């Protein structure tokens, strides 16, 4: 018999996420789309990582920032308070990619709109994938919160 460990999301589900203002909207193209080579690397990697959602059709998205994250995100200083920080809302897929902070360090989670943890539903939803991109693109991401 084989057993595995399901770690789940590190960031908690942000119960009031729908009240956070949308700071940016766009779309992740479907898997059949050609990605422009002129886009920033983090955008291309995000598209490649999540173009499978909604049966390969991609998804519209909204970026939402909590009230406590707006100042540090705008200042790009990395001084996020503990708690909920940001959500990338995949509207067509009804999925939330969540960033929160604990002791100044980013925590990541993936949830359905209903709060169900989806971090084990696909390899690209694992926390280590979030951490790799969010820490690997310092031109776009500061302390785990990325901007366009």
Regions found by a protein language model. Give the residues of each.
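Sequence context surrounding c-type heme c attachment/ligation sites in exported
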Residues: 6-30, 72-148
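General detector of N-terminal leader/presequence modules that precede the first folded domain
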Residues: 4-61
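Generic alpha-helical secondary structure signal
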Residues: 54, 65, 115-117
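Short, structured beta-strand/loop micro-motifs enriched in basic residues and often containing a Trp
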Residues: 57-72
């Amino acid at each position: 018999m084989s057993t595995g460990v399901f770690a789940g999301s590190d960031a908690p589900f942000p119960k009031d996420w729908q009240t956070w203002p949308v700071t940016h909207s766009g779309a992740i193209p479907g898997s059949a789309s050609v990605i422009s080579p002129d886009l920033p690397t983090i955008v291309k990697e995000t598209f490649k990582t999540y173009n499978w959602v909604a049966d390969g059709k991609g998804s519209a998205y909204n970026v939402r920032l909590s009230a406590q994250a707006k100042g540090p995100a705008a200042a790009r200083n990395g001084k996020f308070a503990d708690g909920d920080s940001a959500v990338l809302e995949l509207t067509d897929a009804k999925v939330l990619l969540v960033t929160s902070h604990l002791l100044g360090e980013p925590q990541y989670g993936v949830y359905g709109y209903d709060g169900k943890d989806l971090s084990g539903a696909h390899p690209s939803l694992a926390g280590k994938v979030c951490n790799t991109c969010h820490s690997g693109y310092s031109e776009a991401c500061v302390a785990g919160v990325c901007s366009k």
